């Protein structure tokens, strides 16, 4: 495809890992002289990077593809490409149902996409990205794929087995992000715990973290840690380095031994509680985020009550909850019946999140009167929307800061006195920036 004067609109759906893939694609295309637009109506080519994790994400991806196929059918665009997880999992079915799509790509087809766009893939520039996040924070994807066998998840089929990026390349990528103004580095993969196991069957996460902490990022944050074999020396390193946030995102999913075994998580209730207690003992100031699944096949009232009791006792600082989604290409889909009614799933989500809201409100009240360092994400008039080190981008608390007439900009660090709080917001006034 000739790239002369071609304008591309890229829609990136789904998780932060997908965002990084899109950022790499944009940069490789730009190096070949291709131009991107923020408006689909101005584009010659539309690329949709899809998500296929759960039913809602699939539906969103399909709806966006259908809207774009209408443009392709009407001649409003010259080409339509679909990439990402949904495309990887259902390429045959999508090709049969959507002939308007010119090309379908998987999750590791960057070189092929650039070639179809009329460019040449440049492996020496793979560490370069054009950020889709605000310029002051970025994701650092330290591995691709997943080798876990969780019964509810099709990620290994979408993205393949776990492949760690070499530490040297990640250092180079991080250094470039720092040079380009990134102040907060968020370390991600499907499972950061497993980083380096494919090198020599041990976690190298702590080795990597020390290397990154030596760079001059203001904040470094750890997201998506699997409980099994989590390296506790990471928590020691967290305490030793002021620029590593006292924050850990560790999806637990459930606490019932029967359900954890059925989920094929590799860890039981005793091991999970012991790990979380060890983490908090090593670092009393740490804030823990987790994710739960309710309505898993066969989940009884007693097992759900056990989960509620666990959450009430452990008092996670941040918690997200999903109703179980019976996904094709998973072990649970093949072997288990989706026997919990959607109404019950919804009620259980609401009950768990109501409990978590009360915990979060109590935890936030403890911060009232404190002076805290915050990172500003957005400014609207005299109000800045910011985050503490305990809050990851896009998913956690906002700090609403009265900045008066102070010249505060996104990306600024400020000290703020917290005056009021609710479950998911802090309110304060600026001291200095």
From Swiss-Prot:
A GO cellular component annotation in the UniProt record: cytosol
Domain Radical SAM core: 132-362
GO MF, one example: aspartic acid methylthiotransferase activity
Subcellular location, record wording: Cytoplasm
UniProt KW keywords: 4Fe-4S, Cytoplasm, Iron, Iron-sulfur, Metal-binding, S-adenosyl-L-methionine, Transferase
Cofactor annotation remark: Binds 2 [4Fe-4S] clusters. One cluster is coordinated with 3 cysteines and an exchangeable S-adenosyl-L-methionine.
Domain of life: Bacteria
UniProt binding sites for [4Fe-4S] cluster 1: 15, 51, 85
Pfam families: Radical_SAM, TRAM_2, UPF0004
Main location: cytoplasm
Enzyme Commission numbers on file: 2.8.4.4
The TRAM domain, residue ranges: 365-432
Protein residues bound to [4Fe-4S] cluster 2: 146, 150, 153
InterPro entries the UniProt entry points to: Elp3/MiaA/NifB-like_rSAM, Methylthiotransferase, Methylthiotransferase_CS, Methylthiotransferase_N, Methylthiotransferase_N_sf, NA-bd_OB-fold, Ribosomal_uS12_MeSTrfase_RimO, rSAM
Protein family: Belongs to the methylthiotransferase family. RimO subfamily.
Role description: Catalyzes the methylthiolation of an aspartic acid residue of ribosomal protein uS12.
SMART domains per record: Elp3
UniProt protein name: Ribosomal protein uS12 methylthiotransferase RimO
């Amino acid at each position: 495809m000739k790239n002369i004067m071609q304008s591309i609109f890229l829609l990136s759906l789904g998780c932060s890992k997908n965002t990084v893939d899109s950022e790499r694609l944009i940069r490789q295309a730009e190096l070949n002289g291709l131009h991107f637009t923020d408006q689909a109506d101005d584009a010659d080519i539309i690329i949709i990077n899809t998500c296929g994790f759960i039913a809602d994400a699939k539906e969103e991806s399909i709806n966006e593809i259908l809207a774009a196929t209408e443009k392709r059918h009407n001649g409003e665009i010259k080409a339509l490409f679909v990439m990402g997880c949904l495309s990887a999992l259902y390429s045959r079915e999508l090709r049969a149902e959507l002939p308007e799509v010119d090309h379908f790509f998987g999750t590791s087809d960057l070189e092929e996409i650039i070639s179809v766009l009329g460019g040449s893939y440049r492996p020496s520039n793979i560490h370069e990205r054009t950020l889709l996040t605000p310029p002051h924070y970025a994701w650092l994807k330290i591995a691709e794929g997943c080798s876990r066998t969780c019964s509810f998840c099709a990620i290994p089929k979408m993205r393949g087995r776990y492949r760690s990026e070499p530490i040297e390349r990640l250092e180079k990528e991080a250094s470039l992000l720092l040079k380009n103004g990134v102040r907060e580095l968020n370390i991600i993969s499907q499972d950061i715990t497993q980083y380096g196991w494919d090198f020599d069957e041990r976690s190298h996460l702590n080795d990597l973290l020390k290397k990154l902490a030596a760079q001059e990022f203001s904040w470094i944050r750890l997201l998506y840690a699997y409980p099994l074999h989590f390296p506790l020396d990471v928590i020691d390193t967290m305490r030793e380095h002021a620029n590593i946030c006292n924050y850990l995102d560790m999806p637990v999913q459930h606490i019932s031994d029967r359900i954890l075994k059925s989920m094929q998580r590799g860890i039981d209730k005793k091991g999970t509680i012991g790990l979380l207690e060890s983490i908090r003992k090593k670092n009393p100031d740490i804030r823990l985020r987790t994710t739960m699944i309710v309505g898993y096949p066969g989940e009884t009232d007693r097992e759900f009550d056990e989960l509620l009791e666990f959450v009430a006792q452990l008092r996670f600082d941040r918690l997200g909850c999903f109703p179980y989604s019976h996904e094709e290409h998973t072990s649970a889909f093949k072997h288990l019946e989706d026997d919990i009614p959607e109404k019950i799933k919804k009620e259980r989500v609401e009950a768990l999140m109501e409990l978590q809201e009360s915990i979060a409100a109590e935890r936030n009240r403890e911060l009232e009167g404190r002076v805290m360092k915050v990172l500003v994400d957005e400014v609207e008039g005299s109000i800045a929307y910011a985050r503490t080190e305990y809050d990851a981008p896009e998913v956690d608390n906002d700090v609403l800061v009265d900045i008066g007439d102070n010249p505060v900009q996104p990306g600024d660090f400020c000290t703020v006195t917290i005056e009021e709080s609710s479950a998911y917001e802090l309110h304060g006034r600026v001291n200095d920036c």
